[in-house]
Amino acid sequence: MSSQYSNVENLSPQTIRQVMKELQDMETTPPEGIKVLINESDVTDIQALIDGPAGTPYAVGIFRVKLTLSKDFPQTPPKAYFLTKIFHPNVAANGEICVNTLKKDWKPDLGIKHILLTIKCLLIVPNPESALNEEAGKMLLERYDDYSQRARMMTEIHAQPVKCGVSDAKDDDGPSNKKHAGLDKKLQDKKKEKLLKEKKRMLKRL
């Protein structure tokens, strides 16, 4: 990966070791509902999958987040982004996350795990008073049912886990199996496309 997109060469060896150790610890013993994705060639590229917490409009989704470490990390906080589209008061249109832990409440010893847990907590308890998405913040405060419906619909459209197809056709290279597998996939794609169009149409009405 080009250093143009990375701060790895600007971090001290001690910081790199510390970050890598924490990521490996989280991979071995993951926090509940969080799976860290390690890029061993660039520890400044930190991504994780967060399960939408039960009892929230995000419950059925899996959300991909990214942390970008600055060259002064851990003295300065990283920037955090949702790579998965989400309707949330504290998430901007470009995915940037607004949370006090990454601003005025930042402390150098908090660590990556604490940041990811804080982001997960933000899905449970949004903070509309410091909204980056003003529409979502206002809707949450004034029309919670509409907010919940909109957030749930965005989750169903954008945050669904990728389901692997049945592997039988892959194991059997017979032309018949290949043909049926192709037809099944086309039918599934059409159904999915139709469902997405219906949901997007409903979103526009909100």
From Swiss-Prot:
UniProt cross-references to PANTHER family, sorted A to Z: UBIQUITIN-CONJUGATING ENZYME E2
InterPro entries linked: Ub_conjugating_enzyme (IPR050113), UBQ-conjugat_E2_core (IPR000608), UBQ-conjugating_AS (IPR023313), UBQ-conjugating_enzyme/RWD (IPR016135)
Enzyme class at the top of the EC tree: transferase
Domain UBC core: 14-160
Native organism taxonomy: Eukaryota, Metazoa, Ecdysozoa, Arthropoda, Hexapoda
Gene Ontology biological process terms, A to Z: anaphase-promoting complex-dependent catabolic process; cell division; exit from mitosis; protein ubiquitination
Pathway: Protein modification; protein ubiquitination
Key words, A-Z: ATP-binding, Cell cycle, Cell division, Nucleotide-binding, Transferase, Ubl conjugation pathway
Chain intervals for the UniProt region annotation (Disordered): 165-191
Organism domain of life: Eukaryota
Protein name: Ubiquitin-conjugating enzyme E2 S
EC number of this enzyme: 2.3.2.23
Family that this chain belongs to: Belongs to the ubiquitin-conjugating enzyme family.
Gene3D superfamilies for this protein: Ubiquitin Conjugating Enzyme
CDD domains in the record: UBCc_UBE2S (cd23804)
Catalysed conversion reaction: S-ubiquitinyl-[E1 ubiquitin-activating enzyme]-L-cysteine + [E2 ubiquitin-conjugating enzyme]-L-cysteine = [E1 ubiquitin-activating enzyme]-L-cysteine + S-ubiquitinyl-[E2 ubiquitin-conjugating enzyme]-L-cysteine
Active site annotation, chain numbering: 98
Family matches, as Pfam families: UQ_con
GO MF terms, alphabetically ordered: ATP binding; ubiquitin conjugating enzyme activity
Function text: Catalyzes the covalent attachment of ubiquitin to other proteins. Acts as an essential factor of the anaphase promoting complex/cyclosome (APC/C), a cell cycle-regulated ubiquitin ligase that controls progression through mitosis. Acts by specifically elongating polyubiquitin chains initiated by the E2 enzyme vih/UbcH10 on APC/C substrates, enhancing the degradation of APC/C substrates by the proteasome and promoting mitotic exit.
Species of origin: Drosophila mojavensis
Biased composition regions of type Basic and acidic residues, renumbered to the chain: 168-191
Record PROSITE patterns: UBC_1 (PS00183), UBC_2 (PS50127)
